[in-house]
Amino acid sequence: MIFVDTNVLMYAVGRSHPLKARARAFFEQALNEGWRLCTSAEVLQELLHAYLPVGRVTTFEDAVRLIERLDIEVWPLEAGDALAAASLATQHPALGARDLCHLASCRR
């Protein structure tokens, strides 16, 4: 199973970017080869946090449609994930809180 982080979805559905074609190719390959993809509710929150304040709700909706079309499993962010993230911080000091939550949910 492959975890899809926020930036990959943003590149795939967002405005022109040097990584847009690469992100779209990743999703096309995942679809063609039947890869199992997952993400988390925290990623959805990050997308909404990025797009809502700048009036780009339709881009958020495009990301949600991509998640649905590719049948990407969306994991909840549980209280235990936040607690695990706090303990993972000492092992991974370069990661921020959100990335630590992603890591914790992947380890669950």
Enumerate the language-model features and the residues they cover.
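Short acidic/histidine-centered micro-motifs embedded in hydrophobic/aromatic stretches
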Residues: 50, 66, 103
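Active-site neighborhoods of divalent-metal-dependent phosphate/nucleic-acid chemistry enzymes
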Residues: 72-108
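Short, well-structured N-terminal submotif of metal-dependent ribonuclease cores
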Residues: 1-39, 52-65
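Structured helix-beta-strand junction loops
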Residues: 33-34, 69-70, 91
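Short, solvent-exposed loop/turn segments at secondary-structure junctions
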Residues: 9, 44, 82
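Anion (oxyanion) recognition and catalysis
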Residues: 31, 68, 107
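Short secondary-structure boundary segments
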Residues: 41-42, 79
